[in-house]
Amino acid sequence: MEKNRERKYQKSEKKHFCSKVILLLLIIPFFRPDFISEMSDSSWINIIFVIWRMTAFFFILGKYGIDFLKNPELDRNFIVIVIYEIILLYSSIYNQEMIKERLIDIANFLGIYFIYISYGKQQPKLFIKVNFQFFSFLVWTNAVLTVIFPHGLNRAVDNSARVNFLGKDNTITLIFILTIVFCALYHNIFPRNPAPFLTTVVICTLQFYYMSGSGIVVTVVLILYLCFVSDWNWINRLLNGNLMFMIYMILEVMIVFLNHIEFLNPLFFWLNKASTFTDRRYYWDTAIYQFLDSPFWGQGNGITYLWNNNYYSHNSFLDILLKGGIAGTVLWCVMVLYLINRVKLKKNLRVKGFIVCCFFCFLLTGLMEGLEDRIAFNAFLSVLPVLNRMEETEMLRNKLINSGSQIKKHAKPVIKYSK
């Protein structure tokens, strides 16, 4: 009897270890550290990651298809994403622009969606644990290398050109926000573990060191929420995706389309970023002018042609307007709002409020950078549909990173899950 029990335990442990390794091997190629492409675009390492990502995509596509055949269930999230991607692909074909790049972006989005939706529903504890450990490893590695190479791995003279382990200062924020999301989810499973808090502290420290304008604003917003208002239920009820998206659009219109930034001058002065916003105006004005040439379908790519060179528009909304025009932009807004509104979490108001706060932080970063083709943002969107399932299985305890180790008395007992 004891031998049979021990064999079952060993078999369970082996199965758990194999699942963990497979999930890790699927995730890694989608989050390749950006320094690889920034510093050695044609290196053999980059080629390995491309092949690895393709293999991971076809593997998870097959798994998703097999799971669907076993349990045919209409995946509305997948349908919304596919409709949006079809419109952008049509825009690229219509304009004969960057068709290959569009197909790669589609594969990246669908690949990470299949991974997150499959493991997030079937093995939620393993899913949270592996993602937290993986992103924490990236963050801590980035921190150590920043201490060793304070001017970046490329030893840049200008901070804006500094290349860190996870990428440049102005794009690394997206990975940091996604990591903090998994810190909060991990804390719900292991409330006494200090690792989520320590990782969050490292992220905040790095953000203030890098002095990226959007990164500092996002960090301040998250600190204010976690430290001061996360316990207020009326705030968490007030926080919803539609309201945050509306505020984001107001900022887009005021800052980008009307170029009225005077009311934010004190903030820009404090961040020492007034010149940065002045430079952004050239990108924004050029992007708006190009968008008006083909307003409905866009130009098929997000490039602005300025000073005889190709530049990024440095704004998420203008980026999608250029790529897909009005048609693509409307569907992008519908997709984003549909996915964020899928999060109910009636028994976990604090977790829901925090997720919406992180959603707003992504949008704030989108004022200065693109979001549509960023794997970190698409991964965040892919997490949203599985949160309700986690609540149904009582995986969530309505706890955040700043919570103590004590579980409140009125909280329901949590069922212990196997690894």
Please state what every model-predicted region is.
Residues E2-Y64, Y84-S92, N142-H151, F362:
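N-terminal signal-anchor transmembrane segment
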Residues V21-I28, V343-E369, V383-N388:
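Loop-to-helix entry and N-terminal half of a specific, functionally important transmembrane alpha helix
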Residues F35, F268-A327:
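Long extracytoplasmic/lumenal interhelical loops at the membrane interface
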